[in-house]
A protein has these predicted regions:
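Terminal targeting/low-complexity segments that flank the catalytic cores of oxidoreductases
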Residues: 1-133, 155-162, 169, 234-238, ...
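Alpha-helical transition-metal enzyme core signature, strongest for iron centers
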Residues: 108-116, 138-153, 179-190, 214-225
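Short, charged, amphipathic alpha-helical segments
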Residues: 133-137, 209-212
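Active-site-adjacent scaffolding segments
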Residues: 146-198
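Charged/polar positions within long, soluble alpha-helices
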Residues: 147, 151-154, 158, 223-230, ...
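Glycine- and acidic-residue-rich phosphate-binding/metal-coordinating active-site segment common to enzymes
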Residues: 179-238, 245
């Protein structure tokens, strides 16, 4: 892997020039040249995983110190890897079959493209210059994720359906909330599945390691989103806070409805993609030859979630909803398993 200057598609009019200018400043702080030494790359990777604010004392949600810490974390943990020169390893026929069979590629590429648009659109509505710049950087990084995925599918000959046209969202805040919460859900389960793939050896370690920076970057993204939520909530007047919380509830309902609709669409005979609508559950069998139960997968997701967040300042907020639900499911599952075990005796 190497370090790179950013490339932004200037044909996309929404704040593209602002994103390019801001992220370019991040690159000028690092080493120059097309390729960096292994030591520099390792240092950049390490910096992306460990960060503590220089601000002493409590980081009270909504305070200026909290805001400065959030934005500094995102800026200072930036990892300038270059998608265009990622070394995609050669796969044998069985490894290639496994990779192509993963039912995620169309959705993954489209999701990153939509996230880029939604984040950039919301950035335009943010008055605070620090938060605006950080959300613009997030939009740029979403675009980089799409580049990584596009290069991967091209390298391995994975065919994708034509992408739908992405339109500027009519309600940028709604789009930002839906995207942020959706990423928080998907990343939680992706952490566990990714580690399962690493442990199983089902895919070459070179491929897993090549994709690792993207996984950690997703952790940074949802860490920022969780803290943006805390900061935003704390700075709303009480009547706007009520409206916002009702909107958050509506977002969760909307996401659930989208997932149900996606499942129905993928189960239909007309679906050419034949993608698995329950990949989070069944996906474990696609990345390991060993049978993995749902509760075991939940435990692994929790462990990986905790591990990836462990390097960041403990005073920053963490995503709580999905981990709490996973712990509840684990608790109920263990209780039920124990109850059945006692009855069997």
């Amino acid at each position: 892997m190497s370090l790179d200057r950013p490339q932004v598609n200037s044909s996309e009019g929404y704040v593209a020039s602002e994103i390019e200018a801001y992220v370019s400043n991040l690159f000028t702080q690092g080493p120059s040249g097309d390729f960096a030494s292994d030591a520099i790359i390792e240092a950049a990777d390490r910096k992306a995983r460990h960060w503590t604010s220089a601000e002493g004392g409590e980081l009270r949600a909504g305070s200026d110190g909290h805001k400065q810490a959030i934005c500094a974390m995102f800026r200072e943990t930036f990892n300038p890897y270059r998608p265009s020169v990622m070394a995609w390893p050669i796969l044998n026929s069985e490894e290639l079959r496994r990779l192509k069979s993963l039912p995620i590629w169309d959705i993954a590429v489209q999701t990153e493209g939509r996230a880029r648009l939604n984040f950039a659109a919301y950035a335009q509505s943010v008055a605070d210059p620090d938060m605006r710049a950080t959300i613009m950087q997030n939009a740029w990084e979403e675009n980089r994720h799409k580049e990584v995925l596009s290069n991967l599918v091209a390298a391995y000959g994975i065919s994708l359906r034509e992408e739908p046209e992405f339109r500027h969202p009519r309600d940028p805040e709604w789009a930002y909330l839906v995207t942020g919460y959706s990423e928080s859900i998907d990343s939680f389960f992706a952490f566990g599945l990714f580690d399962l793939a690493r442990r199983s050896g089902f895919f070459p370690m070179e491929l897993v390691e090549t994709f690792e920076p993207v996984m950690q970057e997703e952790c940074r993204h949802i860490l920022f989103f969780a803290n943006w939520l805390a900061w935003h909530r704390a700075n709303l007047r009480w009547y706007r806070r009520i409206h916002f919380e009702l909107r958050v509830i509506a977002v969760w309902v909307h996401i659930a409805w989208l997932r149900i609709g996606m499942a129905r669409m993928m189960d239909s005979p007309e679906s050419a993609a034949h993608q698995d609508n329950n990949f989070t559950i069944n996906g474990a069998q696609a990345v390991t030859p060993v049978a993995v139960g749902f509760l075991e997968l939940m435990q692994l997701c929790l462990m990986e979630n905790d591990r990836r967040f462990a390097g960041y300042d403990s005073r920053l907020s963490r995503p709580t909803t999905i981990p709490a639900l996973a712990r509840f499911v684990l608790g109920v599952g263990k209780f039920w398993t124990g109850l059945l075990g006692r009855r069997a005796r």
